[in-house]
Amino acid sequence: MLLAVLYCLLWSFQTSAGHFPRACVSSKNLMEKECCPPWSGDRSPCGQLSGRGSCQNILLSNAPLGPQFPFTGVDDRESWPSVFYNRTCQCSGNFMGFNCGNCKFGFWGPNCTERRLLVRRNIFDLSAPEKDKFFAYLTLAKHTISSDYVIPIGTYGQMKNGSTPMFNDINIYDLFVWMHYYVSMDALLGGSEIWRDIDFAHEAPAFLPWHRLFLLRWEQEIQKLTGDENFTIPYWDWRDAEKCDICTDEYMGGQHPTNPNLLSPASFFSSWQIVCSRLEEYNSHQSLCNGTPEGPLQRNPGNHDKSRTPRLPSSADVEFCLSLTQYESGSMDKAANFSFRNTLEGFASPLTGIADASQSSMHNALHIYMNGTMSQVQGSANDPIFLLHHAFVDSIFEQWLRRHRPLQEVYPEANAPIGHNRESYMVPFIPLYRNGDFFISSKDLGYDYSYLQDSDPDSFQDYIKSYLEQASRIWSWLLGAAMVGAVLTALLAGLVSLLCRHKRKQLPEEKQPLLMEKEDYHSLYQSHL
């Protein structure tokens, strides 16, 4: 049944999204530095005739950067995307996309006016058909060439400043693998020189917003590819895990019986080929990953360097991260202390919040623990566990946002490592998104997590809000009732006082009780109250 669904999907759909729009990679586009493709609905650039958007100059932030990358004009990702384009579509209202043909996250419908909240669920809560459908969608993405996007296989300089385009087709799944490689690759300085201390999505403030957008775009493309608008990425809750409980053939793949570094032949993913994993080879040739298959997925969970990562994260580790009030601190890189981002990413201890270069914890611990393809930053997205892992990391980010409710100004405006300032555009996304745009609640982006819905403090606020609104509507009646009650209380108190005086006159003074009867005391107390 699963194979029948998969083959049906493979023959039915051809779509994608990700990096360089196919419509914008001609020599004309590259030399004119313009990416404003027509929207299919009216054939005008950016859907301008329909009011969806228009072609505009890109306004880049001039906020100062941190000292980690001491070069200028040597890397295509600097001041993204200005090396390739200085004009792109600027979409209006709730429209989004490289040609304004899509809706912003959280909006649906032909005019993008409908709000919708999707829920990401624990993979262990999926039924067998739901789980098999998820695996079928992954395989479909792995076998569907993108009709919308291509990947560059050379630098802008190697393309002779755009006059000789160098781009390849790629399937949808590997497109996102390539994006994760490209955003974290070393800087190629020419000759045999490289610069390793550069990463536009890790080791700095944009780590969490970048991966949030990455998952949203991945999710959105699977929805388009399959026609399943309710699709969401499941998460793996790894808190307190003693082993990789999703590393079975029923889920993400068990171990090969004769080669522990490979997946079991019975695994859904055992035949997958990986891409973008040979970083040193690319560096030595001053070249980019071109999407060529490079061998099978490798994974040997638990047989890693235990001196660096002695255990998987605990619930207490997560709670300590959430208790940290600062999103970012100090140098805003992997040496930051008491930084929620740096602690969750795994460069600071989840016991103290102090940066520790000798240990890999939290998010990093899972990558190290997998001991294979997922353990290398650039190629880690080849392993589909990457999606489940980062969905859960994003849920922890969401918990922190809900607990501390930071203003957007909490996200650093300046002096972060290159590509990580609040107004910097995220590499390598087209359409363009800023880091600060995703420093907001997931609900504002149209999704939530199943395990957060039960504990969300907002749910109590929403529950009581209706009662407060009703109270405001009947406030004048309540005020009038209170005044009448006060008058009646005063009259009753006067009557009780008269009765007491009359009683004192009837009893000799020495026979009068020191206290009233219990019932009388209660009535008087309540009346005075």
UniProtKB/Swiss-Prot annotation:
PTM statement from Swiss-Prot or TrEMBL: Glycosylated.
Keywords from the named record: Albinism, Copper, Glycoprotein, Melanin biosynthesis, Membrane, Metal-binding, Monooxygenase, Oxidoreductase, Signal, Transmembrane, Transmembrane helix
Molecular function (Gene Ontology), one example: metal ion binding
Membrane-crossing segments per the record: 477-497
Membrane-protein topology: Single-pass type I membrane protein
Cofactor(s) demanded: Cu(2+)
Region called Disordered, residue ranges: 287-313
Main location: membrane
InterPro entries: Di-copper_centre_dom_sf, Tyrosinase/Hemocyanin, Tyrosinase_Cu-bd
Catalytic activity: 2 L-dopa + O2 = 2 L-dopaquinone + 2 H2O; L-tyrosine + O2 = L-dopaquinone + H2O; 2 5,6-dihydroxyindole-2-carboxylate + O2 = 2 indole-5,6-quinone-2-carboxylate + 2 H2O
Cofactor note (record): Binds 2 copper ions per subunit.
Gene Ontology cellular component terms for the protein in this record: melanosome; melanosome membrane
Residues carrying covalently attached carbohydrate according to the record: 86, 111, 161, 230, 337, 371
Top-rank taxon: Eukaryota
Signal peptide: 1-18
Binding site for Cu cation A: 180, 202, 211
EC id: 1.14.18.1
Positions on the Lumenal, melanosome side per record topology: 19-476
Subunit structure, as described in the record: Forms an OPN3-dependent complex with DCT in response to blue light in melanocytes.
Sequence similarity: Belongs to the tyrosinase family.
Biological role stated in the UniProt entry: This is a copper-containing oxidase that functions in the formation of pigments such as melanins and other polyphenolic compounds. Catalyzes the initial and rate limiting step in the cascade of reactions leading to melanin production from tyrosine. In addition to hydroxylating tyrosine to DOPA (3,4-dihydroxyphenylalanine), also catalyzes the oxidation of DOPA to DOPA-quinone, and possibly the oxidation of DHI (5,6-dihydroxyindole) to indole-5,6 quinone.
Clinical condition linked: Defects in TYR are the cause of oculocutaneous albinism (OCA). The only known albino gorilla, called Floquet de Neu ('Snowflake') had white hair, pink skin and blue eyes (zoologic park of Barcelona, 1964-2003). No differences were found at the amino-acid level but the activity of this enzyme was lacking in 'Snowflake'.
Protein name per the record: Tyrosinase
